Amino acid sequence: RGADLAGFRYRLHQAMRNLRDQVGKAGIVEVQSERAVVGHFPGGELAGSADLVMKNARGEHAVVDMKWSGSKKFPQKLRDNRHLQLAIYAELLRQEHGAWPSVAYYVLDRARLFAPDDRVFPSAEVVPSADGENTAQLWQRFLATWRWRVSQVQSGRFEVVLDSIPVTDESTAPEDAMGTETLNEAYNDYRTLAGWENRA
């Protein structure tokens, strides 16, 4: 509908103006969109496409993940230090440039930039992690989690994580790994394994 389209255009325009202001205040001199990032980890090669990779006049890099909505969800990911997609992009850029970049989420429908610190973006809404850990430590937790899960798979054990399944010793992550997270069932590719209900 015309009104919906007009509203969408207005919010998108405001979001782009705000992002341009953030970029200007940060002294950004280079912006790359849909930037390919490639690297490796103990399991093999990793590759992805970061929404925005920026560099300021001091040569510091930042990777920004653009989201249409989620002004509560994504700050919470930073608070819980569970921004894994950003952490993976950051590690791949670290492998390329030799230093950890800053990370941030930009939520378009609210024109809000969230970051765990203001190192690159001085006007960002800073959301530090509750436990004091940073993106580099999240990456190390991911590696510990990967090693734990690989050892389970190699021994023929595949965990289905559901709220309705009691926690056991085998389903408890090691202390240096990421805590187990129950994902939204709407995005579960393995619902057939997890079971279903007849809603008719």
Each language-model region and where it sits:
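RecB-family 4Fe-4S metal-dependent nuclease core
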Residues: 1-200
